[in-house]
C-alpha cells in the first residue's frame, strides 16, 4: 500500500532551526502537510485537535519533554496508534531503550540527513 504523501505530520522541537530543517527534509521527500509545535504540551494539544499520520518529536524540551509527550500519546485511546519517531542528540542506550519501552516506532540521532530520515520513515509508515 502506498503512503499518503498528503498525510498530516506533526514535528515537535523547541529549536526553530531544527523545525525548519526537518520541515525542509520532509518537503524534499515529498511531504508538504506539516504542522509544528515547540514543546510536548503544545504538541499534545495539537494532537488531540487533529489526527496526524505521523509525529516526529525531539526528546529534550520544556515544559513537557518529547519522552513525556510520547507516553501521553500512547496512553490516549484516540492517539495511541499514531506512528511516532523520536529525534534527539541523545544516543545513550538507556534513552533508546526507554523510548522503545514507551512505544516509539523509531529513533533518529542528530545530526541526520534526508536519506536517514527516509529510511526511518519507510520503516514506520511504508515505502514511498
Over which residues does each language-model region extend?
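Alpha4 helix (beta4-alpha4-beta5 surface) of REC/receiver domains from two-component response regulators
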Residues: 23, 68, 91-106
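Helix N-cap/capping motif at the beta->alpha junctions
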Residues: 36-45, 66
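Short amphipathic alpha-helix used as the core "switch/output" element in two-component signaling
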Residues: 45, 67-80
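Active-site beta3 strand of CheY-like receiver
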Residues: 51-56
